[in-house]
Structures are given as C-alpha cells and as structure tokens.
Curated annotation (Swiss-Prot):
UniProt keyword annotations, A-Z: Amino-acid biosynthesis, Aminotransferase, Arginine biosynthesis, Cytoplasm, Pyridoxal phosphate, Transferase
Modified residues annotated as N6-(pyridoxal phosphate)lysine in this record: K280
Protein's organism: Synechocystis sp. (strain ATCC 27184 / PCC 6803 / Kazusa)
Thermal dependence of function as given in the entry: Optimum temperature is 30 degrees Celsius.
Reaction(s) catalysed (UniProt annotation): N(2)-acetyl-L-ornithine + 2-oxoglutarate = N-acetyl-L-glutamate 5-semialdehyde + L-glutamate
Main location: cytoplasm
Encoding gene per record: argD
Biological process, per Gene Ontology: L-arginine biosynthetic process
Impact reported for D251A: Loss of N-acetylornithine aminotransferase activity
Annotated cofactor note: Binds 1 pyridoxal phosphate per subunit.
Effect noted on mutating K280A: Loss of N-acetylornithine aminotransferase activity
Pfam families in alphabetical order: Aminotran_3
Name the record gives this protein: Acetylornithine aminotransferase
Domain of life per record: Bacteria
C-alpha cells in the first residue's frame, strides 16, 4: 500500500520527547489508597506518549492501539494539539457561557459546515452529550408533538450510551444497570440490526396514542462488540421515523470525528440523523462533548439546559486543532488505508487459528476480532498477553478484541501490531 503523505508530514515534524527515562517510582498501593475503585486497571502506569507510542513509569514502550479508548485522535503530543492548547491556555482557558466565547462559535461553525447539523450544544463528555439529546427529545415530544403519554426512547440491546442514570438506562446492557434502581423511566429496547423487531416494538408502543419519541442508536456498536450497522436496517429506521414523527438520534461518541474513515459514522449508512452526539476524539483527549441537531428540533431555550465548562475556550481550541488537522492532513485517507491493512492482518491471524477466532469486523480504525464462543480464552487474557509483548488493546466484551489506534498510526506500526498480536496469541495456545 502507498505510504500516506499525512503520516510522512507527521513524522517529519519529529515529535519532541525530551526525557524517556523511567519516572519516579510509582506505587500502585498509594494510588489505590486514595482513588476510588471504579476501574479494573491493568498493572502498568503510563508516564508519557509520542505519536502512537506510550511509555510506562519503568521506561517500557508500548504501541497504543487503545488511544484512550478511541479518544487520542492525533495520538500523543501531536504538535498541532500541543500548540493549540499551549497558546490558548496562555490567553484564556475558561469563561462563563454567560458571555460569547469566540472559540466555541468557531468550533460550532466548523461542525455545522461539515455535517448534517444546524446547531451545536457543547458539554464535557459523551454521557453529557447523550443526556442533552435525551432532554431535547423529551421537550420536543411535549412541546411540538403534544404527547399525551410519557415519551419513550427506543435504544438497542448491547448498546452503550454512558454512565449517568439516564444513560445507563438508555444503555441496553443490564450489567451496567445493576444496583442503580430506580432507573429513569421512558426507555425500551430492541435488538440491533433487526428490522422486524423494531417495527413490532414501534407498533406496540404507538397503539392508541403516540409514545415513541425517538430511536437512539449507534452507527456501529462499540462497547457492544464492534458491530457495524446494517445499511438496509438503518434505511428502514429512517423511514419509520419519517412516517411516525419520530426523531432519529445517533450516538457518535466513539465512532465520530474520522474514526471510521469518514468524518461521521452516519456517512456509512446513507441516512442522516436528526440529532447526533460526539465526544471522545473531538478534542483529541481534552475533555469535550457535543450534541448536534437540525434546526427543526432545536427547541431548547435559555434555562432548559446548560454546562459550566461546556464549550470553554481551551477545549474548543483543542477541538478546532483536531478537526483542522484531520482535514488539512487528509487523515481520513490514512484511516481508510490503515484500517484495510489492519483488517487484512487480523484476517490472516483468524485464518491461522480458525477454531479460536470467528470474525474480523469494523470500519476504518475501529475494528474487532471475535473469539469463538467455544474457546476458553477471553479477550482480557489476550489483552494481557499482548501488553506483555508491548501492544495495548482493549476488550469490547468478554469475546471481542478492540483495535482503536490513533488516526496518525503508520503502515509500519500496523504491521508491528499484527506481529506482536500473533506472538502474544502463540503464548496462549
């Protein structure tokens, strides 16, 4: 394959990492004493990064195919992001949304001009963006559609939409809801990519008075096992929404901002949402979230929703740097080429171990390798073995390995990652 001019230009800038010596001794016991136990952490502590490489506190290097879970769009210490954040924090890092924030307006304009949206609301995370979408849907149902009954939002089984009470309720995975009753009312679930089940559910809920206010889906399910949406399914979803005055909402928190080889995941499906959300990769690792909508459903008024930190100058400067770099360096070309290369390499591994792996799937640089249900191996076991060999991966459920490297990953790094994975698997079988 041809070597992307994007990657050449990134490498030519020579990321400046001045000290790769081991950091001061890090004690996990001290960390665990003071930090709440909300993550099952792997036993390494990350000290610094450059491009697609991370170093731990002992000086060991790793190829980073987690990227903060699809968040470090430009990798680590990218000059454009470093420059944007450094310049902005010396000028103005935060001011209230009681005033106009030029960087926020500029970022909103860029997003609108490069998407199907007309308006943008900024917040700080994917969960917050999805909360904003849920509130917008409910207000639209009450004020525009004049619902007589409680609005219902349909989401997919095996979905993931966040960790707040509303978003774990929207998430179609009971394991995330356990112990958090009472959940937020107004949600129901259908199997992903199943047209008949969706049609039946809408018909059942709308019998008598309309109740379905929105259908809320991921274009590709990330936490649900890296499962791409089916074109025929999403075309029918759009038709159902149009025929029944139902809003179509897409959660693009993990797949948006070029991750799939297109700027937005919905571009793979041939339909446009009425509302969609973004976060993770939008500012390359600087906390940000965004909820976008078309003008007809922009029913928020002052006081309906807000965010203290949402759209602050620092996060918006970072977001602009990421998006302009994606566009200016033609990173989508690199994502498509490196994604094809990665899937080809994973397919070779699957063919080498036909009883261990069943499927390679994904778009661009979000890909999954599924482990056979008959195998005793789990995704976490392979993740640990790969980490020992110097490759960081993330599980997407107990039987799926997830590959989400930075969008600047090189041809050589993809080849190296595939070889490391091959070696790691060999230690387990």
């Amino acid at each position: 394959m041809t070597y992307s001019p994007v990657v050449e230009s990134v490498e030519a800038q020579a990321f400046a990492v001045t000290d790769l010596s081991p950091a001061a001794e890090f004690k996990t016991a001290d960390f665990d004493t003071y930090v709440m136990n909300t993550y099952g952490r792997f036993p390494i502590a990350i000290a610094r990064g450059q491009g697609s490489t991370l170093w731990d506190t002992e000086g060991k290097s790793y190829l980073d195919f987690v990227a903060g879970i699809a968040t470090c769009t430009l990798g680590h210490a990218h000059p454009a992001l470093v420059r944007a954040v450094s310049d902005q924090i010396q000028k103005l890092h935060h001011v209230s949304n009681l005033y106009y924030i030029p960087e926020q307006g500029e970022l909103a304009k860029w997003i609108v001009e490069h998407s199907c949206a007309d308006r943008v609301f900024f917040c700080n995370s994917g969960a917050e963006a999805n909360e904003a979408a849920i509130k917008l849907v409910r207000k639209y149902a009450h004020t525009v559609l004049d619902f007589l009954e409680q609005p219902v939002i349909l989401t997919a089984k095996a979905s993931f939409h966040g960790r707040t009470l509303a978003t774990i309720t929207a998430t179609g995975q009971p394991k995330y809801q356990q112990y958090f009753d009472p959940l937020v009312p107004g949600f129901d679930y259908v199997p992903y990519n199943d047209i008949r089940s969706l049609e039946n559910k809408v018909a059942d809920l709308d019998e008598g008075n309309s109740r379905v206010a929105a259908i809320f889906l991921e274009p590709l399910q990330g936490e649900g096992g890296v499962r791409p949406g089916d074109l025929a399914y999403f075309k029918r979803v759009r038709e159902i929404c149009d025929q029944n005055d139902i809003l179509l909402v897409f959660d693009e928190v993990q797949v948006g901002v070029g991750r799939t080889g297109k700027l937005w995941g919905y571009e793979h499906l041939g339909v446009e949402p009425d509302i969609f959300t973004s976060a993770k990769g939008l500012a390359g690792g600087v906390p940000i979230g965004a909820m976008m909508c078309k003008k007809f459903c922009d029913v928020f008024e002052p006081g309906n929703h807000a965010s203290t930190f949402g759209g602050n100058p620092l996060a918006c400067a970072a977001g602009l740097a990421v998006l302009k770099t994606i566009e200016g360096d033609r990173l989508l070309d690199n994502v498509q080429a490196r994604g094809e290369q990665l899937r080809s390499g994973l397919a070779e591994i699957k063919n080498q171990y036909p009883t261990l792996f069943t499927e390679v799937r994904g778009w661009g640089l979000i890909n999954g390798l599924e482990i056979s249900a008959e195998s005793s191996l789990t995704s976490v076991e392979i993740v640990k073995a790969a980490m020992e060999q110097g490759l960081l991966l993330a599980p997407a459920g107990p039987k799926v390995l997830r590959f989400v490297p930075p969008l600047v990953v090189t041809e050589a790094e993809i080849a190296q990652a595939v070889e490391i994975l091959r070696q790691a698997i060999a230690t387990l079988v």
